Amino acid sequence: MSRNRKLVHTVVVPIRWGDMDAMGHVNNTVYFRYMEQARVDWTHAFARRLGRVAYAGDGPLIVNASCTFFAPLTYPGKAEVRMFLGVPGRTSVESYYEIWMDGKKYADGAAKLVWIDMKTTRPVPLPEPLRALLDIAETAPSPTPADAKPS
């Protein structure tokens, strides 16, 4: 997961009995729904801050999504989904997600968001208020242990 990212939204999602599968844990497809809930909530909150209606005129479209599972979530419980955004490109930004419950991380996720004109479905530049929100330094990430130089 990128080190150049900013926490933009957190949502608590109740785990429903119907989220479970025959294996007795939350089905892997539901993790994507939890991330979707965080993303949609954030999109609406961001639009409200701008005095706009979400998805009216322009907004994010997912072009890919992934999830890495660390442990199975089970009912009952409440999953905390943390949404982060990375360094913006011209028309896109990477979103990252962490799914937690009771102080333990259960999954990491990611989705590339391309900002589009809703009528034409063509990419458009990211809104300036989104760029200002992110304002993440576009510097090289800190060295990883493999990159670190001996002292």
Give residue spans per PLM region.
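Terminal targeting signals and extreme-terminal segments of soluble enzymes
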Residues: 1-80, 86-151
